[in-house]
UniProtKB/Swiss-Prot annotation:
GO molecular function: alpha-mannosidase activity; carbohydrate binding; metal ion binding
Bound cofactor: record note: Binds 1 zinc ion per subunit.
Top-level taxon in the UniProt lineage: Eukaryota
Lineage: Eukaryota, Amoebozoa, Evosea, Eumycetozoa, Dictyostelia
The gene coding this protein: manF
Protein name: Alpha-mannosidase F
Length: 994
């Protein structure tokens, strides 16, 4: 009897699946899924062992049951899947492969994780997606066609731009501003063609977006991991689902309704869940077959759902509307803006950026080998660890403390792997013989003299594909072999001399006695000597230097700290006027190209300020005006060297902070418990540095460094208040392009609403005045929140430590008392003439190039044997100015893979260049293959012309004109070595060579 019952269910199901919808009928597409965070309240490994391993196994076993209606499942997080794959016997793996082949398991997103969209960089998003696609291609021969960004806290326009170029045609979104979601539902615009790069690559960034009308979890009472089925009974659940279908169908133009079935770590008992869902599906379809309902139901993948939806739109000639911006900030009510996580856990954000840059450099070094040696496995392992950090509860800083520590451990593991491999790779690239090992010197590290050795050698390496100049700052030990101090202020000369290539080629340096800053002002300061000198390196090149102890060097400037107060510091570009705290008051320009003209004064008025923050890891929420804590200047130092002038101050602030011995919650306007207050003093280190090398592109940038710690219950910001008439608008980047950001009002912002005008920035932010043509730009060392809270104002959030919990799942406050060095560089510039238009924001090419320079500093390696070290250039000719090799890695003994990016202004023409004769290690090019951005899957036409669009904006007017170039599919001619790139376009290729 039971078998007969299931036979009837199968007949009913297949009858409905093949059924062609009639007018007035609704088709429910149930999408079974399990959203498995790669760390959040538990670590990734804790989640895997405790839940995810059994979820995947249970799901596969449930799909093996053929006696039920055809079950389907979508899976996203490939990092978890690799762990599971390595644990499983071949029989279960074969079951999984079978279900993928039969389209019953679909990979959606297919990244290593589901990446955050506000804090992850362009390079890191590409990396984590590529690692996931590599696993999918190698194990299953498939590639994803749909994005599944259901949990990030707001959506970036970088998402459609990248995913479309990874071969995706559709993406599912969830968290958009509550007012927008309401508007889209009312106007049936929850589905639209999303163009991520309207001024850049245009059609190449188009994707069909679907926004959940509610949330990514199962509808009420429809989660079948628990007891809902028994509690409510099949008849009631059937009627509720039919009513749900009718209610939700009014939000869409087509009668196809997507219903997510699952949620966080759902399907722990997939067999039970599917058995109950089978009965629900059969009951719904049975009522339809009996003429009692207009709703039919099936399990679907995203491919099924989008295919049916697009076909209906085409058959009925109903177009999708259009959107060409992003979805920041995200809010779920008027008092809850998810703008805090842009800045939360800044130490983690900064360390991830540092390790990612090192990893990129190591991958490039792997391609530069001349003896066919490369180390792909170690670098791939490091790449996977870095990819985990892109998860939307990792780089966002929204995990519990022990999970954050796990992320640090993963980064440290990757850091060690990358250091070990890059030391070998550079040594191998410089010599075909058996070189001794090089030691990479990280930021904050120092060069070390072996005992009884008066000279050491080191190498600088430029990992960028254009020539670059920097002012190099290197720490050197301050104690001699016999324990004598080398940096005593009573010394009258620098104890070191620096030479390039050999000791006959001595170069001029600034040499200064220093000590590390300790935020607690303890006495255990580490003393050192700092060597500063300008260095210019060719693209992908190394340069050899020698440092030697010498008592009276001719070209070493001994720069002693001055303790008397300076009102200003200067270089060839600016005079920077300082206030009593050694923060900038104004800039006087010495050049007509900076600040509006020679002798023109631009008000800057820098402040280090504090918000009282009653939000949590996700939510930035204030309850009083931003303020400066009571402050004293503890000490000041000024260094006046040949190549720089630097003003340093130590500021002692007094804070009234909340007692952190209890946990407190804030919901809406109600504080559940009054916190006890205590008074503490903190010491903040501030440095402002003007560089004087004679290179205008370097010297125009003012270098800032704040050494600060998190203060409980606060967000610490740096604010510039300028005389630039910006109408409280600013531009911040999404990792690829600058985005125009409007503030909520042109008037002064009332308390509690400041956070509504906060936006994320990955690398750069600026304000400008179209009337005066003046622009103020800042490049950042990590992602952070930025805003313009008043006319001429630009502020950047630097640190947060929370004593309230915002009710978003962490359950405990995100207390973060870590000390960080928050670095950024800022400069005055002119608004390019080609941006004198309604949208503004031109000149993004130079801003992008300068931010890349800031992100990827020269790397320093100390050598043990200089006979195997040399200055060497691996590029034989320069690329055009704005052509950037985004990534490069060895793919085989005689092949390399590259992503090449045209970062030029979107108003410019395409650029053509020749790969032939570009690299010193390539004698001749044998063949070229083109891939999509994954560098895993070939570049094929993922045409979406069948998705008809009105090009009518779903929000106001279109922000940008509709452009049709470059075309979505524009393959290169692989029979020749010339490449053409449109502005903002990225091409991914593999070169096989002789």
């Amino acid at each position: 009897m039971k078998n007969f019952y299931y036979f009837i269910l199968i007949l009913l199901f297949f009858n409905e699946v093949c059924y062609s919808l009639k007018d007035g009928e609704i088709k429910l597409h149930l999408i079974p899924h399990s959203h498995c965070d790669s760390g959040w309240t538990s670590t990734m490994n804790e989640y895997y062992m405790g839940q995810v391993k059994s979820i995947i196994s249970s799901m596969v076993q449930s799909l093996n049951v053929e006696s039920n209606p055809p079950r389907k499942f979508v899976w996203s997080e490939i990092g978890f899947l690799e762990q599971w794959w390595d644990d499983m016997p071949i029989e279960i793996k074969n079951d999984f492969i079978k279900h993928v082949k039969n389209d019953r398991i679909e990979f959606v997103n297919g990244g290593w994780v589901m990446n955050d969209e506000a804090c992850a960089s362009l390079e890191s998003v590409i990396r984590q997606l590529s690692n996931g696609h590599k696993f999918i291609r190698e194990k299953f021969g498939k590639q994803p066609e749909s994005g599944w960004q259901i949990d990030p806290f707001g959506h970036s326009s970088l998402t459609p731009t990248l995913q479309a170029q990874f071969g995706y045609k559709h993406v599912v979104l969830n968290r958009i501003h509550y007012e927008l979601k309401k508007k889209f539902k009312e106007e049936k615009n929850l589905q639209f063609k999303w163009r991520g790069s309207p001024e850049g690559v245009g059609p190449k960034s188009d994707i069909l977006a679907h926004v959940f009308d509610d949330f990514y979890t199962s509808p009420p009472h429809m989660s079948f991991d628990g007891y809902n089925f028994l509690a409510y009974g099949l008849p009631r659940l059937t009627m509720e689902m039919i009513e749900l279908a009718r209610n939700r169908s009014v939000f869409y133009k087509s009668p196809h309704v997507l219903i997510p079935m699952g949620g966080d770590f759902a399907f722990k008992n997939a067999y039970k869940s599917f058995e109950q869902m089978d009965q629900l599906v059969a009951s719904i379809n049975g009522q339809h077959a009996n003429g009692e309902s207009n709703v039919i139901c099936q399990y679907s993948t995203l491919a099924d759902f989008f295919s049916d939806t697009i076909n209906w739109h085409n058959e009925n000639k109903v177009s999708f509307n259009y959107y060409d911006s992003d979805f920041f900030p995200y809010a779920d009510d008027s008092n809850t803006y998810w703008t805090g996580y842009y800045t939360s856990r800044p130490l983690l954000k900064g360390y991830e950026r540092h390790v990612s840059s090192k990893l990129r450099s190591a991958e490039i070094l792997s391609a530069l080998q001349n003896d066919e040696k490369y180390y792909p496995n170690q670098l791939l392992n490091a790449s996977k660890q870095v990819s985990i950090l892109q998860h939307h509860d990792a780089i966002s800083g929204t995990s519990k403390k022990h999970v954050v520590q796990d992320y640090f451990s993963r980064l440290q593991k990757a850091d060690i792997l990358v250091s070990e491999q890059s030391e070998k790779l550079l040594a191998s690239a410089l010599s075909q013989h058996s070189p001794t090992k090089l030691d990479i010197i990280d930021i904050g590290g120092s060069l070390n003299f072996p005992k009884n050795n008066d000279a050491i050698s080191f190498i600088l390496f430029n990992q960028l594909s254009w020539s670059k100049e920097e002012l190099i700052s290197i720490k050197v030990q301050s104690v001699g072999d016999h324990g004598e101090s080398l940096n005593s202020p009573t010394n009258n000369a620098c104890p070191y001399v620096l030479a390039q290539e050999d000791f006959l080629n001595e170069i001029e340096i600034d040499c200064s006695p220093r000590s590390d800053f300790k935020s607690d002002q303890s006495d255990d300061h580490k003393e050192f000597i700092q060597i500063d000198f300008p260095a210019k390196l060719k693209p992908f090149s190394s340069k050899l230097y020698y440092l030697k102890r010498k008592s009276n060097p001719n070209k070493s400037n001994w720069v002693l700290p001055k303790t008397n107060h300076f009102n200003s510091i200067e270089n060839s570009i600016y005079t920077a006027n300082l206030d009593e705290n050694y923060l900038i008051k104004s800039l006087k320009s010495k050049s007509s190209r900076h600040g509006g003209g020679a002798n023109q004064i631009t008000e800057i008025n820098q402040q280090l300020l504090t918000y009282s923050d009653i939000g949590g890891a996700y939510i930035f929420r204030t309850n009083k005006q931003v303020f400066q804590p009571p402050r004293q200047v503890y000490s000041t130092f000024t260094y006046i060297g040949k190549f720089y002038q630097e003003a340093q101050s130590i500021l002692q602030d007094t804070h009234q902070i909340s007692n952190r011995n209890g946990y407190y919650y804030y919901y809406g306007n109600n504080q559940q418990q009054q916190q006890q207050q205590q008074t503490i003093s903190t010491f903040n280190y501030n440095s402002i540095k003007l560089i004087n090398t004679g290179n205008e592109m370097i010297d125009k940038k003012i270098n800032f460094n704040f050494h600060i710690r998190g203060i409980n219950g606060t967000t610490t910001i740096n604010r510039f208040t300028t005389d630039i008439d910006n109408n409280r608008e600013l531009y911040s980047d999404n990792g690829l392009e600058m985005m125009h950001r409007k503030s909520i009002s042109s008037q002064s912002v009332e308390v509690g609403r400041e956070t509504q005008s906060y936006y994320p920035t990955i690398n750069s932010v600026y304000i400008e005045s179209q009337s005066t043509g003046k622009r103020f730009v800042c490049n950042n060392d990590r992602s952070r929140g930025v805003s313009s809270q008043g006319q001429g104002c630009l502020e950047m959030a630097l640190h947060r430590s929370l004593t309230y919990e915002d009710g978003k799942g962490l359950e405990i406050p995100a207390i973060d008392e870590s000390s960080i060095n928050a670095r950024f560089e800022c400069y005055l510039d002119e608004v390019p003439s080609n941006s004198q238009q309604s949208n503004g924001g031109g000149g993004g090419d130079d801003i992008r190039k300068q931010s890349i320079n800031y992100q990827h500093k020269f790397q320093i390696y100390q050598g043990q044997d200089s006979s195997y070290m040399s200055s060497k250039s691996f590029m034989l000719k320069p690329l055009p100015e704005f052509i950037h090799i985004l990534s490069m890695e060895r793919s085989g003994p005689r092949s390399i893979k590259l992503r090449i990016h045209n970062i030029e202004n979107n108003n410019q023409s395409p650029i053509t260049f020749d790969l032939n004769g570009l690299f010193s290690f390539i004698k001749s090019i044998k063949s070229i293959k083109e891939y999509n951005l994954s560098l895993i899957n070939r570049f094929v036409d993922n045409n979406i012309d069948n998705i008809i669009s009105s090009h009518r904006s779903i929000v106001g007017k279109n922000l940008f004109p509709i452009k049709d170039t470059p075309t979505r599919f524009n393959p290169i001619n692989t029979k020749q070595t010339k490449i053409t790139l449109y502005p903002s376009e990225i091409k991914a290729i593999e070169i096989t060579y002789h």
